[in-house]
Amino acid sequence: MTLWTARAAHRAWLDAEARRLVDFAAAADHPEHGFAWLDGSGAPLPEQGVHTWITCRVTHVAALAHLEGIPGASALADHGLRALAGPLRDPEHDGWFTALDSRGTVADSRKEAYQHAFVLLAAASATVAGRPGARELLDAAAAVIEQRFWEEETGRCRESWDAAWHADEPYRGANSNMHLVEAFLAAFDATGDRVWAERALRIAHFFVHEVAAPRDWRLPEHFTPDWQVVADYNTDDRAHPFRPYGVTVGHVLEWARLLVHVEAALPDPPSWLLADAEAMFAAAVARGWSVDGTEGFVYTLDYDDTPVVRSRMHWVVAEAISAAAVLGQRTGDERYEHWYRTWWDHAATYFVDTVQGSWHHELDPTLAPPPGGTWSGKPDVYHAYQATRLPLLPLAPSLAGALATVG
């Protein structure tokens, strides 16, 4: 079977889609404070203010685009770096606020591991891209993470603190730690410091090999401060965008991909990384893809595999595409090519918005954009953009590291 990625037309399609996503994200440029939340047509939503995670993701994508030689991307990356070094950073207690309002006033002063993971990711990618101030930002973010979030005794990270770092939240989460794996791998590529790869391995070992594997690859997302599973967390807010109840199908796929990146970072990787990656992928497909009579991935499952939230999120199919591309490259197994083609067809048919730009972020169970839902507008291009880049890159700990080897 000839891989789609070996065909010039497919590679050109991926490149064109990547450029389209970068162009859409460029409209989020807030003059002073970072990157705004965009509505469905790509216009900033002032009422949403500026979120640190969105600013970081656009900065990361812009740094990758600059590494690829896309004119104008460097200015976007530099704008994001200035915002992260300036208004989004706490000048009194250090660390990064969660959000500002449209005037630049702090709207959410919490210090979250999720936000800090993306600060580190953006800074690391921009460091590889050679952007001014990026390495200083990376070092600052790394210091805060090491001092406030990293638990050396457990090998994973706390969730969040108040603004002054006095009280940490009595909750631990898989989502933030998963993104810290990604950020730590990017920091390893940017600095060469192996401690980041070793920490990524420790986090992955706990969540995948210790928690998911004994549960037949069903990954609980929510934990007590001493890392006991809280199975009924958010039963009253099951579609929460960051902490939904039950098993999040897209995260199972994302972990499958990240395990391969962890493997690429280690000189002598343990064999369980690839074995667990393939098992996580297979479980997500069997339990999450078209299981309710309609094409697509459901958002969440109960622990008996019953669909809970049947909405289709754009980031889930994007992560599925990325996982299929990475595992296909790693193993050479044609099953992954089948799924890679299937999910790009699905994404192009239902999610890619060729009229207003970017991707629909959410579809209802009939595959139509809902009037309301978990997500409003189109704030994020990060998952979709990475799905267009990973299929064309060699395996590496991070996207920036991979681009640096082919640039």
UniProtKB/Swiss-Prot annotation:
Regulation: Significantly inhibited by divalent metal ions such as Cu(2+), Cd(2+) or Ca(2+).
Thermal profile of function: Optimum temperature is 60 degrees Celsius.
Activity's dependence on pH: Optimum pH is around 8.0. Stable between pH 4 and 11.
Catalytic activity: D-mannose = D-fructose; D-lyxose = D-xylulose
Molecular function GO terms recorded: isomerase activity
Segment forming the signal sequence: none
Listed GO biological process terms: carbohydrate metabolic process
Entry keyword annotation includes rRNA processing: no
Function in brief: Catalyzes the reversible isomerization of D-mannose to D-fructose. Shows weaker activity on D-lyxose, but cannot use N-acetyl D-glucosamine.
Identification of the protein by name: D-mannose isomerase
Organism: Thermobifida fusca (Thermomonospora fusca)
